[in-house]
Curated annotation (Swiss-Prot):
Gene, per the UniProt record: dsdA
One Pfam entry name: PALP
Cofactor(s), names only, from the UniProt record: pyridoxal 5'-phosphate
EC id: 4.3.1.18
Keywords, alphabetical: Lyase, Pyridoxal phosphate
Catalytic activity: D-serine = pyruvate + NH4(+)
Entry-linked HAMAP family: D_Ser_dehydrat
Protein name: Probable D-serine dehydratase
Family statement: Belongs to the serine/threonine dehydratase family. DsdA subfamily.
Length: 443
């Protein structure tokens, strides 16, 4: 990694001074381009997403058997989209600027199995690995009924292998629960930010939890090292995994189908804005990629980060990507948004997606808590703090007339817009933990 000359960096990029001061910032990305220009840099395309979608369909009968809570959705993990008009009215007043389009919430917070967006990528990567092992051993072919995997024979087969991952919490939950269900020995390396209840839940599923006093980067590094020592151990690399990324990307076509069913139009006259909380970047990056493939240049994605962990904004803004961490600037990477407590962004995601992302913004922990309290009060929806990071996004856009003009969004177009806030987690937060969150809100 480079030695960072902070003075030189702030001279070149004045915005970095605001990041160091922990001020909430909004930055619209001048590199943002069309899908045609940006797509080649990703190194993946629609056929890769179709392949991921087909794999999830093959596993759907197995999922119904292994997780009865998925039977209602026929073994496919998907979350609902709901309108939140009371919250919209409250925030129009709170922020003193009016968002005129339609405000919707994507409830990945309530996905089955692990209650977060990470159920998409984490579970998909475990299923992909299991399928490859079983096919290679001659125990499975793609035409089979995958319910056969839900058997003692396969549990014993997968029991010869292990899976490891480093996580701040939610990814570990998804990978841990899925791997243990299949029969793998699974170890989750948890950073200091990880919540106790998440560790407890994993241990209840027979997952080995290794705890660290350091942050996410250390947990990942230790997990990687341990996996290297065991030829039968597969390490799921949140920082660089294209498989995880593709697991998230399937969300794009799913949203398109949901919008069709809801009668929501997306085109040049009816733009779609999507606000995604960002940690290391794999989840929001994969979802944004899928949305771009589904809606093309009519969808505009913004990433949201805590003021104490603005790793992706920092990496893309300076062009240094994973060659810089927030700690290099003296930012502490300590935030209540445990899922977003990442100091160094994924270099793969930053470089792949920097031309397909319209903007980035940061918000304080207290703002996340306040929004958490307001959403619970106004819409009776309870989320964890990090899931609220996307909520101020529409107002950041509404407040920036210059960017609207530059991008050709007039008042009439914005009134026809749809704003989709991606709620990334919180559906499985224990009641006593949720009470603490709500008590921290100043509303």
């Amino acid at each position: 990694m480079k030695n960072i000359d902070v003075q030189q960096l702030t001279n070149q990029f004045p915005l970095v001074q605001s990041l160091i001061a922990l001020e909430p910032v909004t930055w619209f990305n001048p590199k943002a381009s069309t899908l045609a220009v940006g797509l080649p840099y990703v190194g993946l395309d629609g056929s890769d997403v179709a392949d991921a979608s087909a794999r999830l369909a093959r596993f759907a009968p197995y999922m119904c058997e292994a997780f009865p809570e998925t039977r209602a959705s026929k073994g496919i993990l998907e979350s609902e989209i709901v309108a939140i008009p009371a919250m919209q009215a409250t925030l129009n007043t709170r922020y003193g600027v009016e968002v005129t389009g339609k405000l919707l919430l994507k409830k990945d917070s309530h996905l089955p199995i692990s209650g977060s967006i990470k159920a998409r990528g984490g579970i998909y990567e475990v299923l992909t690995h299991a399928e490859q092992l079983a096919i290679k051993a001659g125990l499975l072919c793609e035409e089979d009924d995958y319910r056969k995997l839900f058997s003692e024979e396969f549990r014993q087969f997968f029991g010869q292998y292990s899976i490891a991952v480093g996580s701040t919490g939610n990814l570990g939950m998804s990978i841990g629960i899925m791997s243990a269900k299949l029969g793998f020995t699974v170890t989750v390396h948890m950073s200091a930010d990880a919540r106790e209840w998440k560790k407890r839940k994993l241990r209840e599923h027979g997952v080995i939890v290794v705890e660290y006093a350091e942050d996410y980067g250390v947990a990942v590094e230790q997990g990687r090292k341990e996996a290297e020592r065991d030829p039968n151990c597969f390490f799921i690399d949140d920082e660089n995994s294209r498989t995880l990324f593709l697991g998230y990307s399937v969300a794009g076509e799913r949203v398109k189908t949901q919008f069709d069913q809801m009668g929501i139009k997306v085109d040049a006259e009816h733009p779609l804005f999507v606000y995604l909380p960002c940690g290391v970047g794999g989840g929001p990056g994969g979802v944004a990629f899928g949305l771009k493939l589904a809606f093309g240049d009519n969808v505009h994605c913004l990433f949201a980060e805590p003021t104490h962990s603005p790793c992706m904004l920092l990496g893309v803004h300076t062009g240094l990507h994973d060659q810089i961490s927030v700690q290099d600037l003296g930012i502490d990477n300590l935030t209540a948004a445990d899922g977003l407590a990442v100091g160094r962004a994924s270099g793969f995601v930053g470089r792949a997606m920097e031309r397909l992302l319209d903007g980035f913004y940061t918000l304080s922990d207290q703002e996340m808590y306040d929004l958490l309290g307001l959403l619970a009060r106004d819409e009776q929806i309870k989320l964890e703090p990090s899931a609220l990071a996307g909520m101020p996004g529409p107002w950041r856009i509404a407040a920036d007339r210059e960017w609207q003009t530059e991008r050709g969004f007039d008042a009439a177009t914005l009134a026809r817009a749809t704003h989709l806030v991606w709620a990334t987690g919180g559906g499985m937060v224990p009641a006593e933990e949720m009470e603490k969150y709500l008590a921290t809100a100043e509303i």
